[in-house]
Amino acid sequence: MLKNSLSWLESYRFNVTLSAQKTLVLIMNYAIEFHDAKYPFLEVAARKKALKHSLLSVVEGLAVIKLGKQEYAIEPGQYFWIPQGCLSSLTFLPNSRVYRCDFSVRLNDDFSQQAGFVKPSPLLKALVEKLATTAERSDLQTDLLTVVRHEVLTLSPKLAHSTLTKTINQWTPGCDMDISKELCLVLTLREARKMKLSGKKKEQIVDTLFAGNTEEYEQLCFLVFGEAL
């Protein structure tokens, strides 16, 4: 009888261990998440505090993050760290693709509280690229994210002003700058959106930014935003 009791106890312990492991995997899946986001049109997010720590990697296109009064261009191949609680707004230009790893505040790791560009290790870059082709909620994704979690703890974020960053910060509607027509168009339409949100009427926006050409304004809105403003 004692032997049977011991066997039952060992079986119980084994099942409890498996259950705990499965629970841990489930927690990890929700505490660390990977997203492969594609933006066919201009996407302008409202300014808000980050609820999670996030690592952004621009694959295609361009992302622009505003911290305080300064904007920073995140170009293809660059990585940017956004700590939890960071007040920022993000703009994703049309046809952009961005990888993002989110880390919940429930994790007790010592994540950097400084926002900025980071230089990923070869391992971290390989992990992020592998995650883009890995099934969501799979055991492999959980394993990869666990290693990513440890890798990001070694990052040292720093803010830097690239030539493109300086250009975007100096840009004003109608100014004569060395800037691509595509970027100038996107910034102009972003300004139009800002004016509308501040209560400006359509006629005033068209007169200020599009020389009174309403038809051109409406066509460009559908082209860049995918809808009318």
Which residues make up each language-model segment?
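Generic protein-terminus/edge-of-domain signal
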Residues: 1-62
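…primarily DNA-binding HTH/wHTH and HhH modules…
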Residues: 6, 18-19, 218-229
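Short beta-strand segments in beta-sandwich/barrel cores
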Residues: 54, 60-66, 79-80, 88
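Short acidic-glycine-tyrosine-enriched beta hairpin
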Residues: 69-81
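Ligand-binding loop in jelly-roll beta-barrel domains
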Residues: 86-117
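An amphipathic alpha-helical interaction segment
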Residues: 120-176
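A short, Lys/Arg-enriched amphipathic alpha-helix from helix-turn-helix/homeodomain DNA-binding modules
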Residues: 164-200, 222, 226-227
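Short alpha-helical "recognition helix" segments of helix-turn-helix
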Residues: 202-209
